[in-house]
């Protein structure tokens, strides 16, 4: 048994999720995957009801219902998210509560692509989910195979419209319900789907292999030694002797060298993604570093004022605004560890944004911040969260 456990840890880990229109079978498919893999000893079977009764979680001040399911294939370990309601999907994808490396787009062959099919594809594109595998569900309910071909063509065209390789994306046809009920042919289809996901969705670059980035939370001076910036390492690794840049909130970038590293008041050889560390910076005085800046590997991230964001605006019930807002609205954008005021410009044809909407708009920040496509932020007004977003495009 001990050997088996060791083996499981060496499998690469991938985050995926089911997306698609309501009632097209996302949760049924999730349940079917766990059932079929459980028969091979690679998962715990979870029934529809237990997945559908997704627990509430809070992510950046927003309540989201999400079911987290784990399973393995021969090659990999997967964490799979499934959300019961459409609003939960939108919030999940925008807040990054569940960062997906790839997605299974579920489309019912009986309906073809529907409004939320399109919306989920757009969201996946905006938040940086680069790989999609399609599961055409309920094919047992369509008598004419030509109709299924037609639906597949529509789905491929829709994916191409949002810059996915629609012609090349794998499409698997089947019935999640039949697989869940134990139909041997459909169980084979589920295995085929999992093999396809293993092959098509690449293993993500591990957080520790990405360039070093640490948002600064606190700054203090150690007499006789210098200035220490502390925070949680977002990605990458850092060690004594590394060159770093101090970036954000001011027009100039300061270069420094790491001369000391501490965690829990003990010295540390190497800090890595997830660690809360204090970084001693050579030749930097207390006034040159502040909360809200980042320490980063030189050249890995730039300062920007203008960006396009994909944003979910909280409802009144979620503690958000009670009224709509218009272009030139000036809230604070909380990036990394600090608030920066920004001016919002709504897209043509969008008069106003209501609480509960998700929307793409342009932002012009009054101070430059170290951001890139995929950086998460919250929108705040007087300290309370009114929205959550992700940078979908840099504009300057």
Swiss-Prot record:
User: Region G3: start and end of each range?
Assistant: 82-85
Catalysed transformations (reactions): GTP + H2O = GDP + phosphate + H(+)
* Keyword Cell membrane in annotation: no
Q: Which SUPFAM superfamilies match?
A: EF-Tu/eEF-1alpha/eIF2-gamma C-terminal domain, P-loop containing nucleoside triphosphate hydrolases, Translation proteins
Q: Where is the segment annotated G2?
A: 61-65
Q: Which GO terms describe its cellular component?
A: cytosol
- Assigned keywords, A-Z: Cytoplasm, Elongation factor, GTP-binding, Hydrolase, Magnesium, Metal-binding, Nucleotide-binding, Protein biosynthesis
Q: Could you tell me where this protein is found in the cell?
A: Cytoplasm
- Broad EC category: hydrolase
Annotated binding of GTP, by residue = 20-27, 82-86, 137-140
UniProt key word Nucleotidyltransferase: no
For the region G4, what residue ranges are annotated? 137-140
Named from the GO MF annotations, one term is: GTP binding
InterPro entries per UniProt: EF-Tu_GTP-bd, EF-Tu_GTPase, EFTu-like_2, EFTU_2, G_TR_CS, P-loop_NTPase, Small_GTP-bd, T_Tr_GTP-bd_dom
tr-type G domain location: 11-205
Q: Where is this region: G1?
A: 20-27
Family, per entry: Belongs to the TRAFAC class translation factor GTPase superfamily. Classic translation factor GTPase family. EF-Tu/EF-1A subfamily.
Describe the function of this protein.
GTP hydrolase that promotes the GTP-dependent binding of aminoacyl-tRNA to the A-site of ribosomes during protein biosynthesis.
Q: How does it assemble?
A: Monomer.
Please state what the protein is called: Elongation factor Tu
Question: Can you name the source organism?
Answer: Lacticaseibacillus paracasei (strain ATCC 334 / BCRC 17002 / CCUG 31169 / CIP 107868 / KCTC 3260 / NRRL B-441) (Lactobacillus paracasei)
Q: What is the lineage of its organism?
A: Bacteria, Bacillati, Bacillota, Bacilli, Lactobacillales
Q: Which gene encodes it?
A: tuf
